[in-house]
């Protein structure tokens, strides 16, 4: 029938209208007046729309085969105008199929200009919202063709126009995604087979190198608008390059992906990074891609991207260190963006990072690691990732992360630990420090739970000096609530503490209760940390200890004065194998802290004592003890005795450190106590001896011996200064301020009243000479046996020959207060006499009826 209608009068009306839009001259374009007639006819007769499309496609194919580009463009333009005008027609799905056939024939021509024309027409089609769904439409061909165009290169048929071909391919893929997402009953564009073509095509253009040969995102604008692009005239200057356009395509693709489709998109991204080695440091391209992904998807789905990256890191555990470093760096860069949505998987993700950290440490220490510096960089990247991860979390989750990190630190309770475990301690403490720097302490009891504080106190006393130093820095970070640590970390001798610019506030009641419970353990840790300070880095460790003491100054004033006196005595102890430099460093810690605390509490007498001691030390010229050298306006600098250290010449006979006989160079505990009492402080705790000694071992299992012979075990329990054994670190309750009352002694306790030992055996004086004599005395077993038999015989004879009542009376007569009943009777008598004296001169109280005596005749 079509062949018979060869003459114009015999053609159907819709064909005559289609033929009329073509001009007679080749140079003329589409006849718009006739195009309006065709459009009106198509709208008025929707049943003819499908046939109009078929006829236009037939003419376009004929013109394409005859290489008539002008007629081809006219047919494409007519199809686009009809598509836009008849978007609500019931015949639009059938017309759309004809339109897609036309686009397909143009793309199959392998002509760059025709492909560009087809892409523009397809983008126009993708912006049409169809009122009725399409049940059989497929876009497989378009995905394949547009992906192929995205990989155009100068050696192909495109020549110098390969960038235009890439842009056309990207816009075509963008149109496919948009049309697939918006259509009802759309084909599943999120299938893995489609994403394996779309995502690599986008990333291939996004990774296009710049003029310097590397990747740079400085010229890529941030797109926040929705997808809008209809024709070539709508493409602005921001989409002139494939890199800019591919970035926008990636963001739109991720923005339209649902939670169930994320895996299909993320997996091709990870595979592309592996194949193109985009993880190699610095992974700027990978960071840009994943940041674009995180910012484009819904915020509640951000944790899924983090989890996929960690799973990919699991699968790459045997890869090169550079690859793992790149993945960890990407995690560190994007984890803060997704931090607010990771709540449900917080510990799972953090545990995965810690597991990779432990695996890296074990691999480095196994001897199989060929590139240890790269492995250390990988560990640093993981630590930074955990720190950045913590920075985006609320405070209560940061505390959970710190507790979780502490729980992974190995072998703190064992007596000996392996070298690899010590290194793991060092790495995990660095991780803990990184997380702690992101936390802002409000109340001490909130962050310093019993188990957490116990672990920190143990970490501060391990073998590794770097771990001890990092633990002190953790204390600085968590104790510092007013940003004072930066001014205290290298505190010198200040004539005026106001120059340090410290922020001082009154201690809260909650912090007072916390310090009352735990200050004993903290001061003990500081004392041992000073004793175990590394000789090779004395100044750093001394500054760290001084900073911790200064941060605790307000919360526990008297106890830290007591610690200072103990540190001074430690520096004077000749039994300790300390160098002169270490002794002088401890003396300087005491002097600097005394100077700071005296000025903070505004105690003039104590400030005068500190200045006197520091001035005497400067005059003596002992190397390392002249704290006035750093003070510009010091009156002591003009003294000839103090200038010896400045000139670098030390006279012969000048001592290298302070001895116990140099009373003028030492702080007197009685003078300090008097100064504190004058300012209204209770200084009774200063005289409680700080009797810990260093006879134990220095390591992880901590068992220490006190000077009075009582064993001290930091894991099982400890003896208090008054002789009471406490259960453990969490039960210690000692003074931290001025309102402390000493506990009742055992002799005054009611549980030891009747059967107490009144005359305890007299012990020998525990002086050094007596102990040496006792230790060097020869042991005579016969004499010891004789004395034991005599003591046993005397006790047995007393029991056999003396009655029990007589022995009880003898014991009571020695100490009447030992009898509880007699003590009560004595108190009653005394109270009765006091009442009688008080009632003298007062009128007699009337007797009650039970006290009136009857007359004698009544009997």
Curated annotation (Swiss-Prot):
It comes from the Eukaryota. Residues 704-722 have a biased composition (Basic and acidic residues). Pfam families: EFR3_ARM. Residues 638-657, 697-724 are annotated as: Disordered. One of its GO terms (biological process) is protein localization to plasma membrane. SUPFAM superfamilies: ARM repeat. Belongs to the EFR3 family. This is Protein EFR3 homolog. The gene is efr-3.
């Amino acid at each position: 029938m079509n062949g018979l209608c060869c003459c114009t009068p015999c053609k159907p009306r819709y064909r005559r209208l289609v033929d009329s839009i073509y001009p007679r001259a080749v140079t003329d374009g589409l006849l718009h007046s006739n195009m309006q007639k065709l459009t009106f006819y198509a709208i008025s007769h929707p049943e003819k729309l499908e046939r109009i499309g078929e006829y236009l496609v037939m003419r376009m194919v004929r013109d394409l085969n005859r290489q008539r580009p002008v007629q081809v463009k006219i047919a494409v333009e007519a199809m686009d105008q009809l598509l836009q005008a008849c978007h609500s027609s019931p015949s639009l799905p059938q017309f759309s199929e004809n339109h897609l056939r036309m686009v397909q024939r143009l793309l199959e021509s392998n002509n760059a200009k025709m492909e560009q024309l087809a892409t523009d027409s397809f983008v126009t089609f993708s912006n049409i919202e169809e009122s009725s769904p399409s049940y059989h439409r497929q876009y497989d061909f378009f995905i394949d063709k547009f992906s192929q165009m995205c990989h155009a290169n100068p050696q192909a048929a495109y020549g110098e126009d390969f960038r235009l071909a890439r842009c056309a391919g990207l816009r075509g893929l963008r149109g496919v995604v948009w049309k697939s997402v918006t259509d009802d009953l759309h084909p599943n564009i999120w299938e893995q087979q489609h994403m394996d073509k779309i995502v690599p095509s986008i990333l291939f253009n996004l990774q296009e190198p710049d003029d310097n040969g590397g990747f740079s995102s400085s010229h890529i604008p941030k797109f926040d608008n929705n997808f809008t692009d209809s024709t070539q005239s709508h493409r602005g200057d921001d989409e002139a390059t494939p890199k800019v356009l591919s970035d926008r395509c990636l963001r739109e693709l991720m923005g339209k992906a649902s939670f169930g489709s994320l895996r299909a998109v993320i997996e091709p991204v990870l595979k592309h990074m592996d194949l193109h080695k985009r993880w190699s440091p610095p992974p700027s391209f990978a960071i840009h891609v994943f940041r674009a992904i995180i910012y484009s998807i819904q915020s509640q789905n951000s944790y899924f991207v983090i989890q996929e990256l960690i799973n990919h890191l699991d699968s790459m555990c045997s890869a090169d260190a550079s690859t793992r470093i790149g993945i960890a760096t990407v995690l560190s860069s994007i984890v803060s963006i997704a931090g607010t949505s990771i709540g449900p998987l917080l510990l799972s993700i953090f545990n995965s990072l810690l597991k990779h950290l432990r695996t890296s440490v074990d691999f480095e220490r196994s001897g199989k690691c060929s590139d240890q510096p790269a492995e250390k960089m990988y560990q640093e990247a993981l630590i930074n990732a955990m720190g950045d991860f913590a920075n985006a979390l609320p405070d209560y989750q940061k505390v959970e992360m710190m507790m979780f990190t502490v729980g992974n630190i190995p072998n703190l309770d064992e007596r000996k630990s392996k070298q690899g475990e010590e290194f793991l301690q060092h790495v995990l403490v660095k991780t803990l420090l990184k997380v702690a720097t992101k936390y802002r302490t409000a109340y001490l009891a909130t962050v310093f739970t019993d188990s957490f504080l116990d672990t920190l106190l143990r970490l501060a006393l391990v073998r590794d000096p770097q771990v001890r130093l990092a633990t002190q820095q953790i204390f600085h970070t968590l104790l510092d609530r007013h940003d004072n640590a930066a001014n205290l970390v290298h505190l010198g001798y200040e004539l005026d503490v106001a120059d340090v610019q410290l922020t001082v506030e009154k201690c809260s009641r909650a912090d007072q209760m916390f310090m009352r419970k735990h200050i004993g353990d903290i001061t003990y840790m500081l004392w041992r940390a000073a004793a175990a300070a590394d000789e090779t880095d004395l100044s750093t460790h001394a500054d760290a200890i001084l900073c911790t003491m200064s941060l605790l100054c307000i919360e526990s004033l008297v106890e830290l004065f007591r610690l200072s006196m103990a540190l001074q005595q430690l520096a004077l102890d000749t039994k300790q194998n300390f160098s002169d430099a270490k002794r002088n460093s401890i003396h300087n810690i005491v002097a600097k802290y005394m100077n700071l605390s005296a000025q903070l509490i505004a105690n003039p007498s104590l400030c005068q004592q500190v200045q006197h001691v520091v001035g005497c030390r400067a005059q003596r010229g002992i190397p390392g003890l002249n704290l006035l050298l750093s003070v510009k306006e010091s009156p002591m600098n003009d003294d000839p005795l103090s200038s010896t250290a400045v000139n670098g010449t030390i006279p012969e006979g000048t001592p290298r450190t302070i001895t116990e006989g140099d009373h003028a160079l030492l702080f007197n505990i009685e003078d300090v106590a008097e100064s504190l009492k004058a300012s209204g402080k209770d200084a009774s705790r200063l005289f409680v001896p700080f009797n810990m000694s260093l006879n134990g071992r220095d390591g992880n299992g901590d068992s220490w011996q006190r000077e009075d012979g009582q064993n001290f075990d930091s894991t099982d329990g400890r003896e208090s200064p008054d002789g009471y054994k406490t259960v453990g670190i969490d039960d210690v309750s000692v003074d931290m301020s001025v309102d402390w009352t000493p506990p009742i002694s055992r002799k005054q306790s009611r549980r030891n009243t009747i059967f107490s030992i009144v005359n305890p055996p007299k012990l020998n004086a525990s002086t050094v000479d007596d102990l040496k004599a006792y230790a060097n005395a020869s042991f005579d077993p016969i004499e010891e046996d004789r004395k034991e038999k005599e003591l046993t015989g005397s006790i047995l004879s007393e029991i056999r020959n003396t009655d029990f009542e007589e022995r009880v009376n003898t014991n009571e007569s020695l100490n009447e207060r030992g009898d509880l009943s007699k003590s009560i009777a004595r108190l009653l008598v005394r109270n009765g006499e006091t009442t009688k004296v008080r009632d003298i001169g007062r009128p007699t109280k009337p007797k009650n009826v039970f006290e009136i005596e009857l007359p004698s005749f009544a009997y």
